[in-house]
Every structure is written in C-alpha cells, then in structure tokens.
C-alpha cells in the first residue's frame, strides 16, 4: 500500500547496473551523507541527479540491505554544489566537470532558470557557442518533458517500462492521444494490447460504446482468432465474439465493419452466402502464398527413361530399394515445380527424400533443406547426412517482434538454390509460408514433406491441408510400412489409430505399453516412477529426455499441475540452486523450460567449452526447450541452454515467455521427437480428445510409448475422428488463381 512506503531523498552517486531495455537499475543514492543501494525500474536516470524515491527496505540474501524503489520523482538540485554535481555528471552531453563549474560560478543558484528560460545567456561563458547553448537547453527540456510524461502516464496505472515505450512512440502527443483515443496504442506500441488500452480508456473516462473502442475490439477478436488457428472469421461469428467482449449490442458492432475496411484494417470477402472477415495482414499473407505457389507450379519435361535410369543407379550405389510410390515421388519431384509428399511414420519419407537429394546432386544442383523447428532440422540432418536448418535461419532472421519478423532473404534478396525441401510441413503456418515463398525464385523446385494427419500448426492457417485439398499440385501419399518399421509397435499402432482401428493393450510389445489406472493421483504416481526409475534404463536416456505429453493445460492431469509435481520430484529445492518466483511458477536452476511465444529479437550464442562465442544469432521460438543454467538476481536474468547449445539470457521482464516443460501439451510437442514419452490419460472435452491428438502424441516417441490411464478414454479417442474447424481460405485462393490462369 502507498501509505506504508518509506521515502528517501538524495543524489545519485553512481549507477552499478542498468538494463537499457527495461530500465531496471541498481544505483547508490547518497542521502544525508549515507549511501543507500536502490533497486528498481527507472525511466531515465543519470549520475548526479537528485531524486526522491518511495519504496521499502529489503534484505537480499547475497547483496544485503537494499531499498526497493516503487516510484520516484526528480528533484531540482537546491544548492550550487548539487547543481554543479548534476551538470558535471555526464547527464547533459557536452558538459564536463570543468564546464559545469564555470556555468555555476557564473549563474549560481539561478542556473536552471537560465537554461530553461534564457538559454542564449549560456554563450556568455567561454567554451559555449550559441548552438551549443541551444543543444544544452534542448537536453534539459527533453528530460523534463520525459519526467512529466512519466508522472502523467503512471497516474493511469501504466508501469514505468511501458510508459517509456509510449513516450518514445508519441512524445508530447501522448497527452492528447491518451485522452482522446488510447486505443491507438494497441496498434502502435508493442506491449500495449487491447486489454491494456481498454483499462487505460476506462480510467480516462472513454465511453464503452466509443467508436474507437469498438473498432479496436473487433481487431482484437480477429487477433485472438488467429491465435486459435483461424486466418478469418465469418461475419456472424466475429460479431458475436466482439459483442461478448465489448458488452455492446451486435448491431453496434456491424456498423463499424465498413469503416475498418475503408481504413484497410480488415478485408471483407463474399464467398457464396457467407462474408469472411480477415485482419488485413492475414488476407495478404494468404493471397501472396496462393500467388507464389501458383507461379512456382512449373512443369519440367524430363523423359521417364532418364529418371528411371538414374534412380536405378542411386539404388545400386546406396543399397536402397524404392517401392512404386517412392519412385513416383522422385519422378514428380523431377518433373514439377511444387510437390507434396505425405505419409505416416515408417512409410519411407526419409528414403524418398534421400533419393531425391542424390538425384539432384548428380545434376550438380544446389539443394537446401529446412524444417520449422531446431529439433526437426537436426533430425533431418541426421537422417539425410545433409545440412538442414530451421526455416528462420535459412531465411536469415534479422530480428523483430512476434508477427513482424524480418528476414534478410526476401523478394529483393532471394535464396540462390535449385531445390528446397521442407520437412514437418504440418507445423508451418501461413505467416512463415508467406515469408518462405517471398524468398523463392520462379524456376526453383519446392518439395513439401509432412504428415497431414498430425495436428495443424500452432499459428494461423491450414497450409499443408489446404495445398493438398486444392488438388492443384502433385501429391504423393506414402502408405506402405516398411519391414524394419513394421517391427515397431509404435509405428504399427500409430497407423491403426490413424485408421480408427482397435489397438491391442496386452503389453506384449517391446515399445508400446498401456498401464491401466483410473484416478489422477494413481496415474501421476505411476508416471513419476516411470520417469525416475524405469524408463531411463529401458531406453538408455536421461530423465530429462523422457517427455510427459498431456492433452490439456488445466485440470488434474493438465500441464500446469503436472509441471509443479514433476519439478518437485525431478529438480527439488536445494541450497545449491537459485530460484526465481514468477507468478504461480518457481523457476529453479536445472529446470526444464519451454519458450511459449515467438520472440525474433532474443539474442543467442553458442559457446565453446572454453566459453568463447563460436556462433550467434537472434530468435527463440514457440516450443523451443532448454535447461536453466543460471539465475542471476543481481542482473535480474535467467540463462537458458536451448537445443544445440544456444545460450539465451532472459531479463526477469521476459519470464512470461517461459514455462516449465517437464510436461507439455501434445500440441506443443509437434515437430519434436523424444526417446520416450509418457501420456497420462483421463477423459476430457470431446472436441479435444480425438484421434488426431492421440496419433500426434504417439508419433513423438522414438523408442518407447507408455500410456497411463483410462483405456475407455483411449478407445473413445480412436473412434472420435472429429476435429475443430479452422477458418482458412488458402484452398479457395489457390482455386481462384487456377480459374483466372
């Protein structure tokens, strides 16, 4: 409570640490000749400044007594010594210690009034020109403007970090914007979404039926829908959702569609008797994706006999023996600009890709391989013997925020290659596909490989399914389970699940087990025993490599509860391990964690065993997993070691982007492969507990699947082939392009 806060006042003697991104600062404040260590977020601070800070004293286990600053205000230096100290501190560029002394000697206690009201008089001092006098005055006034803006914004509950971003975006315009249309901030300022803007608007006194509020709310609903996988919403559904969110009558919502369309914030498409409404960004992503795929869909005239002769040479050299569908896939790859290869586990996708690679190598063609995630790319490299990268790295990510990634490879700087093969295509959303296609020159062959029966991408769109369903591009479906794969019950049962067939649960398998338990606590106890005692020896992997996959986030067997229990079991508290509490989560050194949103600006580096940086880049992505190496309370950072040794430093302000990953949702596991998976299973919502979800979970395991739970739920999931509909228009756009061609 504000009334319980203490106040201290003094000057900043020196700054120990400052994070320029979020304003977190550790400084020493001299108060009545006593030094106080102050810790907090400061919008703008410099050595020599006089401040009054409100907060409370705490005892840090390592650094001792500190004053935790909740708010502060700048105080004008009251005497000539304080004025000289401030001016000579470096806070004002161009004024050093000697010049500060001359200024104060000339103007004494009147110095700040002279700078603010009669800055030209500074030129009376030797070493200061009229131009320099104006520059000094500008700096002083800018700092004053920033402080006043901070006070203004904070009265509406805006924290210091966000207030700085807002001020940097609008400057002195912020006063008018906040009182007239705070919803502008949701468009312009990263970190201010509709919910934040709406809260500010409520405090400012904006009406709930304000035009600005309704338009911003409509855009927010479309953004939320994209998070659910939709690229558009039917008008009726959009109206209903927006009406519930805003608590405004539906007719008031519909009145604003045309204005938003005229401002090009949304795009409205009439398809038969339905109106589809897109956020403009997703409309153009779909349109561009359809256009560029159509442009790549060339036909190359290569005789059958020539292709077959080369395939035989490759088979003889490698010892591979292709079936008729695999041969067909190679032929289609040679003859077409775009090819889709799809099939379940053990159906020979890897053999087919390897043959295609060797075919084009014999022609001296340049080849690029990529996949959506680091794990998938690594697996692709291991199975082909050819370098594979993430799509982001192939496109040379240059940083940007979620939904606004920048790539060095684009229309102006395309990829220089003859063939691109993308694996795990079911994970690729419309945004990434759009960026990929922008960087591909016409004449380049593109092969898309994936399992269409897995869960769709986390991001918006149904890219792989729409491409296949359009029937515009040759698609080879591999269905034969090869001899080596047919000995694996993981693969055999995955295909049975996919076909809706009964799976034997007699546990006579060597890699697929079902342990029947019907109560959540008993399921959890068995899961703990498997991870800690039985599976590490059985599969020859560490307990950290065994992944718990669960259908839901909430509930008795949800991710949140399981992670708390698994953390206590696998990485309990220890005097040797530092912790950081963040909301309901306690992060601990040694914890397994996952990035839960794309952050294209986060920097990473790979270090040698001597600690030297041998590679670096930007971008950590939704689903990336790693281990917490270090928690640094002084710097307020957590360092995570991700796959491939990428070290990433998170400020405490970014911890919303991390969560524990001992257990993850099946959806989040897409594109990953683990030595062993454990799937705790009880009943859940019918739309979620379906065949598609179960199939995806089972196919994540390389050596062993163990399902612990209710066999009736397992059988119901196999029978349930219903899937939640995704609103995606790529198929229609492709067909429209075909008609126009």
Locations of regions flagged by a protein language model:
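N-terminal pre-P-loop "Q-motif" helix
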Residues: 319-335
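Conserved helicase motor core of P-loop NTPases
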Residues: 452-618
């Amino acid at each position: 409570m504000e009334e319980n806060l203490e106040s201290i006042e003094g000057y900043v003697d020196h700054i120990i640490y400052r994070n320029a991104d979020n304003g977190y600062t550790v400084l020493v404040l001299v108060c009545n000749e006593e030094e106080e260590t102050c810790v907090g977020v400061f919008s703008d601070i410099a050595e020599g400044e006089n401040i009054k800070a409100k907060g409370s004293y705490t005892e840090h286990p390592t650094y001792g007594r500190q004053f935790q600053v909740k708010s502060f205000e700048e105080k004008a230096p009251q005497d000539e010594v304080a004025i000289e100290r401030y001016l000579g501190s470096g806070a004002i560029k161009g004024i050093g210690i000697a010049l500060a002394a001359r200024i104060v000697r000339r103007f004494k206690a009147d110095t700040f009034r002279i700078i603010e009201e009669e800055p030209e008089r500074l030129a009376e001092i030797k070493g200061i020109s009229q131009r320099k006098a104006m520059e000094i005055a500008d700096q002083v006034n800018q700092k004053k403007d920033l402080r006043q803006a901070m006070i203004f914004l904070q009265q509406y509950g805006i924290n210091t970090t966000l207030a700085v971003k807002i001020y940097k975006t609008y400057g002195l315009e912020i006063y008018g914007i906040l009182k007239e249309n705070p919803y502008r901030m949701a468009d312009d300022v990263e970190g201010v979404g509709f919910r934040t803007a709406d809260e500010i608007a409520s405090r400012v006194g904006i009406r709930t039926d304000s035009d600005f509020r309704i338009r911003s709310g409509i855009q927010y609903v479309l953004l939320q829908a994209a998070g659910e996988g939709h690229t558009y919403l039917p008008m009726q559904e959009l109206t209903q959702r927006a009406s519930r969110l805003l608590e405004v009558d539906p007719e008031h919502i519909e009145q604003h569609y045309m204005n938003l369309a005229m401002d090009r914030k949304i795009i409205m498409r009439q398809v038969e008797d339905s109106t589809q409404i897109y956020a403009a960004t997703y409309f153009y992503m779909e349109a561009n994706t359809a256009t560029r795929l159509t442009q790549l869909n060339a036909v190359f005239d290569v005789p059958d006999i020539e292709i077959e002769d080369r395939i035989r040479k490759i088979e003889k050299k490698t010892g591979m023996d292709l079936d008729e569908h695999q041969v067909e896939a190679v032929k289609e790859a040679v003859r077409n600009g775009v090819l889709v290869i799809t099939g379940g586990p053990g159906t020979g996708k890897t053999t087919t890709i390897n043959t295609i690679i060797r075919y084009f190598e014999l022609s001296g063609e340049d080849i690029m391989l990529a996949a959506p995630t680091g794990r998938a790319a690594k697996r692709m490299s291991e199975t082909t013997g050819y370098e594979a990268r993430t799509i982001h790295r192939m496109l040379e990510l240059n940083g940007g925020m979620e939904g606004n990634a920048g790539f060095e490879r684009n229309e102006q700087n395309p990829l220089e290659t003859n063939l691109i093969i993308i694996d795990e295509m079911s994970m690729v959303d419309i945004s990434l596909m759009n960026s990929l296609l922008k960087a591909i020159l016409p004449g380049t062959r593109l092969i898309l490989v994936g399992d269409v029966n897995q869960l769709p991408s986390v991001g918006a769109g149904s890219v792989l399914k729409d491409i296949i369903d359009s029937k515009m591009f040759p698609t080879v479906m591999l269905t034969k389970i090869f001899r080596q794969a047919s000995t694996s019950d993981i693969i055999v049962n995955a295909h049975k699940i996919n076909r809706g067939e009964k799976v034997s649960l007699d546990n006579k398998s060597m890699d697929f087990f079902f342990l029947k338990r019907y109560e959540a606590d008993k399921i959890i106890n068995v899961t703990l025993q498997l991870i800690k005692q039985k599976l590490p020896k059985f599969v020859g992997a560490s307990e950290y490599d065994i992944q718990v996959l669960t259908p839901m986030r909430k509930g008795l067997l949800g991710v949140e509860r399981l992670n708390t229990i698994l953390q206590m079991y696998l990485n309990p508290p220890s005097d040797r391990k530092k912790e950081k509490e963040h909301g309901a989560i306690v992060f601990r050194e040694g914890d397994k964690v996952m990035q839960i949103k794309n952050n294209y600006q986060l920097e990473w580096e790979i270090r040698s065993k001597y600690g030297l940086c041998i590679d670096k880049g930007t971008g950590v992505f939704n689903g990336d997993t790693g281990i917490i190496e270090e928690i640094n309370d002084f710097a307020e950072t957590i360092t995570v070691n991700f796959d491939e040794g990428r070290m990433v430093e998170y400020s405490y302000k970014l911890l919303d982007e991390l969560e524990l990953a001992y257990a993850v949702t099946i959806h989040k596991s897409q594109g990953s492969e683990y030595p062993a998976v454990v799937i705790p299973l009880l009943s859940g919502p019918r739309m979620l507990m379906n065949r598609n979800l179960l199939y995806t979970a089972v196919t994540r395991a390389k050596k062993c699947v163990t399902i612990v739970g209710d066999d009736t739920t397992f059988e119901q999931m196999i029978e349930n082939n219903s899937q939640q509909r995704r609103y995606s228009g790529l198929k229609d756009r492709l067909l429209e392009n075909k008609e126009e061609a």
